[in-house]
């Protein structure tokens, strides 16, 4: 489980000091819940996120243990270093918007016909309660030829999960290489 500290002060000087000491600044918030200003060791946070298996993961801040989802993050424009992360509390029974990642399986037929697999979207925004939330959407791309796409409407949504995006938006496709 990922462990962090509660930030007592939210001043600019205190934030800079924490970043210098190797901490990642985080805000944890949720519907009807009090915001928690936290900080995590940057290396531990990145390592944990790369190896996590589920979209929703537990964190311990001070003596509080909450289930969260990464909602938004900020990177340094030059170095690409992670500066700040917003974590949304995943409360059972409360529907919220989440960005669910896309994973593809198989090799498209179109790659043999001088095509290239293109991701139009890496994540799909859905509204669901955390208990119904899929960890990812797996798309089978083996039958895609040059010019074919998988659209939002082609994705099977689990029960209790709603997608409000335009159904004709492409997610992945194969285009002709130039």
Swiss-Prot record:
Query: Signal peptide position in this chain?
Result: none
Q: Which InterPro entries match?
A: Rbsml_bL25/Gln-tRNA_synth_N (IPR020056), Ribosomal_bL25/Gln-tRNA_synth (IPR011035), Ribosomal_bL25_b-dom (IPR020057), Ribosomal_bL25_C (IPR037121), Ribosomal_bL25_long (IPR001021), Ribosomal_L25_dom (IPR029751), Ribosomal_uL5_bac-type (IPR020930)
Coiled coil where?
A: none
The cross-references to Pfam families, in alphabetical order and at most eight, read: Ribosomal_L25p (PF01386), Ribosomal_TL5_C (PF14693)
Q: Which GO terms are recorded in the biological process aspect for this UniProt protein?
A: translation
- What PANTHER family has UniProt attached to this entry? RIBOSOMAL PROTEIN L25/GLN-TRNA SYNTHETASE, ANTI-CODON-BINDING DOMAIN-CONTAINING PROTEIN, RIBOSOMAL PROTEIN L25_GLN-TRNA SYNTHETASE, ANTI-CODON-BINDING DOMAIN-CONTAINING PROTEIN
This molecule's function is given as: This is one of the proteins that binds to the 5S RNA in the ribosome where it forms part of the central protuberance.
Quote the subunit structure annotation. Part of the 50S ribosomal subunit; part of the 5S rRNA/L5/L18/L25 subcomplex. Contacts the 5S rRNA. Binds to the 5S rRNA independently of L5 and L18.
- What is the name attached to this protein's record? Large ribosomal subunit protein bL25
Organism listed in the record: Nautilia profundicola (strain ATCC BAA-1463 / DSM 18972 / AmH)
The gene for this chain is rplY
